A protein has these predicted regions:
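Bacterial N-terminal signal peptides that target proteins for export
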Residues: 3-22
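Bacterial N-terminal signal peptides
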Residues: 19-32
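Sec/Tat signal peptide C-region and signal peptidase I cleavage site
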Residues: 32-38
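Extracellular/periplasmic catalytic domains that process cell-envelope and extracellular macromolecules
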Residues: 36, 54-56
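Residue-level detector of short, conserved catalytic/binding motifs and their immediate flanks
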Residues: 40, 58-62
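N-terminal post-signal-peptidase region of extra-cytosolic proteins
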Residues: 42-49
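Soluble extramembrane regions of membrane proteins in the secretory/endomembrane system
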Residues: 50, 60, 67-71, 76-140, ...
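Activation targets extended, charge/polar-rich intrinsically disordered C-terminal tails
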Residues: 129-379
Length: 379
């Protein structure tokens, strides 16, 4: 019994130290955001909750590190020291097609990384999200009767890392591309017409990435029955990165914050979700065996993509990065302002206590550290 207690205590201390080191790395990254290279990143977010169990395709968003939000519906260039914005399409949020939220609030529903709790429960997440809403999002989600917190899907705008693990795929961008993106989105009509089949969050990510990398993202008629999914957008981007090393693709993972909230699940495509689920597969096999066989072939042919359950940093070849292993060779870093992050082992445990925040790799010189392993959405 004493051995078990000591083991648990040691594990808890290790998680705390890893969390502090991660905060140091994130602080270094954000401090240099105004000087480092511009980039655009696809965020492929794991499914969670009841809807995620029914539809395990997850959610997708776009992170732009040199573009910031003048408001949730207006974009501007970032000032030195600002960390960029996450933009995505939502269903029934203020009647809008897209909403832009600063990175740290999007992930943690706070305005500074030092405020991120080390672990959370549902009540804490609700309190943090509502506090941010009352300060910044009343126009999109006004108070209910008697000043109460309103129901609705506004909760998807902040605190995402409390609910799920997020996988990121980053490519470099230029100031001219960012300026064009800002002009296009500030001028276009921002009216929601969400449709899960033809106009969903992954379709939005595809449109955004097409501005930066024309024709890089495409639907998969075979693996996803023509529906754009977060996993297909990621797969297309990875394939593009293989063929075009000049985009300097890198990958990162933002782990789900520890706590009592149920862990998110791996992202699936359409065919994959049907093939893997017994509640769909067995009835389909009985009723339409030919169709079921076709789905299995589709999944095996185009639906697979290596995303290890213990969520390491992985590269453009979908290879899992083991802790301490050298980063596989890819294009050399040609940007003298592109700062290298130190290896996590070199970080000092002096940052404020917080949860594991982000593990990121930008170049072959940096090493990856593993994220906490989850026990085994498009919300």
């Amino acid at each position: 019994m004493n051995r078990k207690r000591k083991s648990r205590r040691a594990g808890s201390i290790l998680c705390q130290r890893l969390g502090r080191a991660a905060v140091v790395l994130l602080a270094l990254l954000l401090a240099q955001a105004g000087y480092a290279h511009a980039s655009v990143a696809l965020l492929m977010e794991e499914p969670y909750g009841d809807f995620g169990a029914m539809n395990p395709t997850g959610h997708s968003a776009i992170y732009l590190n040199h573009i910031c939000a003048a408001s949730p519906t207006e974009l501007r260039p970032c000032q030195p020291g600002e960390s960029g914005v996450v933009i995505s399409r939502y269903h029934k949020v203020g009647g809008l097609d897209w909403v832009a939220i600063p990175l740290i609030p999007y992930l943690y529903a706070v305005e500074d990384v030092t405020q991120v709790p080390q672990s959370v429960d549902k009540a804490q997440v609700a309190a943090l999200s509502d506090a941010y809403r009352r300060k910044h999002l009343l126009e999109l989600a006004p108070n209910g009767s008697d000043g109460r917190t309103p129901k609705g899907e506004w909760t998807e705008l902040v605190g995402e890392s409390y609910l799920r693990t997020i996988h990121g795929f980053e490519v470099v961008s230029t100031a001219e591309q960012d300026e064009r993106f800002i002009a296009l989105f500030n001028d276009r009509k921002n009216t929601g017409h969400f449709n899960i089949l033809v106009h969903n969050c992954a379709d939005f990510s595809r449109v955004v990435m097409d501005i930066y990398l024309p024709n890089a993202i495409h639907r998969s008629v075979v693996a996803d029955l023509g529906i754009t999914t977060p996993k297909q957008v990621a797969r297309s981007l990875v394939q593009y990165g293989r063929k075009h090393p000049e985009v300097e693709m890198s990958a990162f993972v933002i782990p789900q914050v520890p706590g009592t909230i149920k862990r998110s699940k791996p992202v699936d495509g359409v065919a994959q979700s049907l093939v893997k689920s017994k509640k769909y597969l067995i009835p389909m096999t009985i009723l339409t065996p030919e169709l079921t066989g076709g789905l299995v072939v589709a999944y095996m042919a185009e639906g697979r993509m290596k995303l290890p359950k213990n969520a390491m940093v992985f590269n453009v070849n979908d290879n899992e990065m083991e802790p301490g292993a050298p980063w596989p060779v890819q294009a050399a870093n040609t940007d003298p302002n592109r700062s290298l992050l130190p290896a996590p082992a070199a970080a000092t445990a002096t940052a404020p206590t917080a949860s594991p925040v982000v593990t990121t790799v930008n170049t072959p010189a940096a090493l990856a550290t593993s994220a906490p392993e989850p026990p085994s959405t498009l919300p």
